[in-house]
Structures are given as structure tokens and as C-alpha cells.
A protein has these predicted regions:
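Sec-dependent N-terminal signal peptides
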Residues: 4-13
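Alpha-helical transmembrane segments and their juxtamembrane interfaces
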Residues: 12-13, 165, 208
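Boundary at the C-terminal end of the N-terminal hydrophobic targeting segment
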Residues: 17-19
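Hydrophobic alpha-helical bundle signature of multipass membrane enzymes
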Residues: 21-191, 212-215, 222, 231-235
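Histidine-centered divalent metal-coordination motifs
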Residues: 155, 194, 202
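C-terminal domain-closing interface element
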Residues: 202-224
Length: 235
């Protein structure tokens, strides 16, 4: 009985340690409904560009390598982001190997994600796969994302925020990090889940969210620790 209670206590402590909440909520983040224009109306030239980019995305699926990347990028998780950018930085980003970088990314990305909630709920834009009634490359998300607004792209907020934050941690790898972050957003067009304008807007939302993060002293401390850890790991 005593052993069971000890194990239970350890489990509860582990769960408490891994549970993370955003540093700021959606109402504390910049409001994209106020600083960005609405998504393009279907009667505009901008929407015709969205349609053209949707066709471009379908063409990209013919490249098996690019298709595989887009499918992998469709997995929304901070651990997947860590895996993606581990290859770019040349170090294993994980809770065990790089705890400071992992914690910075976890709290940072959970917070920047908040910036997409207000505009998504406000516009509730129809996603391209729903608009065209066509399948995506990642069917498991199709059902629930039908009721989730398309503008701006939440995945792109995640991927571009990560790229910006890691550029601060590893400025020597800035170009490669940002190129991968850009590719991550384009994967959403290829997947059929987002219009190009959703992705473009999301990069601006992510940039605004990261700027807001830097006004929070708790986060600036996390960035400093992450940078110090990276400099030790790359030696």
C-alpha cells in the first residue's frame, strides 16, 4: 500500500511538471481582427490567387519527397516541431537533451498559439478542402477542422513562431531555420487545409505574437537560458 502511494505521488508530480499553460491568454495577445485585413472575398483578385495556389499545392503533391514533408508537418505538436528543427540545428531538441530550449519552445509556442484564436473565431473562414469538397493529404484531421476557422493558419503560427524563436537562440543558423519555417507554412497549402492568404496572415500574426512575448520578463529569461544551452551544445 505504501509503495502504491509513493508511486502515485511520483506520478502526480511528473504530471504537474509536464503540464504547461500559456504565459499570456488570447486577450493579452495582439488582436489580428484589428491589425490585419479580413480574408479575401470570393469575388476578388486576391481570392483568385488563393485558388491558383490551391492548384499549385496539388501539383506539389506529385513530388513524393515534398508530399512526405507536408504530411509530417501536418502533425500539430510541439514535440513534432522539436523533431523538425532538431535536424536544422544539428542537435536533438528534447526535454531530456535540451531542457532549457524545450521549455522555452513549449511555453513560447503555447502562448503564440493564443494569437490565432480571436481571428479564427471571428471570421470562421471555410477551408479549401471543404470549399472544393476534395480530400486532403492528412484525412484524420478533416472532420474536426471543418468547424475550425481557416484564417489565419494555426499550424503556420506554430511553425513560424518556432522559427523566429529558434533564430534568436541560434543566429548562426538563421537562414536555414527561417527557410524551414517558411516551408512548414507552405505545407498547409499543399495539404489542402489552408488558402495561401491564411498562411501569409499567420506569419504576420506569429511575428506580432513573438514581439508581444518579448515584453514579458518571464519569457526573456527563458530565451537567455535557451541561448546559453545552445551555445554549450554546439561546441
Amino acid at each position: 500500500m505504501k509503495r502504491t502511494l509513493i508511486l502515485l505521488a511520483v506520478l502526480l508530480l511528473a504530471m504537474a511538471a509536464t503540464a504547461q499553460t500559456p504565459l499570456l491568454d488570447s486577450l493579452q495577445m495582439p488582436n489580428a481582427v484589428r491589425f490585419l485585413p479580413p480574408p479575401p472575398d470570393t469575388a476578388t483578385a486576391a481570392f483568385q490567387y488563393d485558388r491558383a495556389q490551391y492548384r499549385w499545392g496539388k501539383e506539389q503533391r506529385k513530388d513524393p519527397v515534398r508530399l512526405a514533408i507536408a504530411v509530417s508537418d501536418a502533425v500539430w505538436s510541439i514535440d513534432n516541431i522539436c523533431k523538425i528543427y532538431s535536424g536544422v540545428l544539428g542537435i536533438d531538441i528534447s526535454r531530456e537533451n535540451t531542457p532549457a530550449i524545450y521549455r522555452m519552445l513549449t511555453l513560447g509556442l503555447l502562448t503564440t498559439d493564443q494569437a490565432g484564436k480571436l481571428p479564427k473565431n471571428h471570421y470562421m473562414r471555410t477551408r479549401p478542402y471543404v470549399f472544393f469538397n476534395e480530400p486532403t493529404i492528412y484525412p484524420s484531421d478533416e472532420k474536426w477542422l471543418r468547424t475550425n476557422g481557416s484564417y489565419p493558419s494555426g499550424h503556420t503560427i506554430l511553425g513560424w513562431s518556432a522559427a523566429l524563436l529558434l533564430t534568436e537562440v541560434a543566429p548562426d543558423k538563421a537562414d536555414t531555420i527561417l527557410a524551414r519555417g517558411y516551408m512548414y507554412g507552405q505545407s498547409r497549402v499543399i495539404a489542402g487545409y489552408h488558402w495561401q492568404s491564411d498562411v501569409d496572415a499567420a506569419r504576420l500574426v506569429a511575428s506580432a505574437a513573438v514581439a508581444r512575448l518579448h515584453a514579458d520578463k518571464r519569457f526573456t529569461k527563458l530565451i537567455k537560458k535557451a541561448r546559453k544551452e545552445y551555445n554549450k551544445k554546439r561546441k
